[in-house]
Amino acid sequence: MSTINTDANEAMPHISVNAQYIKDLSLENPDAPSSLAALEHRPQIDLSLDINITNLSEENFYEVELNIEAVARNEKYKLFQVELKYAGVFNLINIAPEQHQILLSVHCPAMIFPFARKIIASCTQDAGFQPLMIDPIDFGALYHKKMSEHQN
């Protein structure tokens, strides 16, 4: 029989995911059914991503929100536009405050992104298109780019 030392485990730095949820979801399919018949070529996809971090009232609890917008077009039609706000509530336990920003900007978004990606893929497929499979995102590179822009 093994004994688990809960005191040692509680002192270890870690991130706890308390909740994940859709805050807002919108899909527009403005030219259906004409646009569905016009899918001869792969559409152009314009993708934007933003991350919002909110310090909740409780100590070390944060909401990290991914705002993703994808617009697909071809020569004739705006095929679809999908907007998703997907968030998670994270508790940063035994983590130094100077590490919070990078964890909330890189690790937490990376933890919830696969769920947001799946929602977008399902929505676009349900709209009659091929599922939009967003490529993995390097949140670390985005964070470092944003930090270097703020320094300049």
UniProtKB/Swiss-Prot annotation:
CDD domains: Translocase_SecB (cd00557). It is found in: Cytoplasm. It holds the Pfam family SecB. SUPFAM superfamilies: SecB-like. One of the proteins required for the normal export of preproteins out of the cell cytoplasm. It is a molecular chaperone that binds to a subset of precursor proteins, maintaining them in a translocation-competent state. It also specifically binds to its receptor SecA. HAMAP family: SecB. This is Protein-export protein SecB. It comes from Rickettsia bellii (strain OSU 85-389). The lineage of its organism: Bacteria, Pseudomonadati, Pseudomonadota, Alphaproteobacteria, Rickettsiales. The gene is secB.
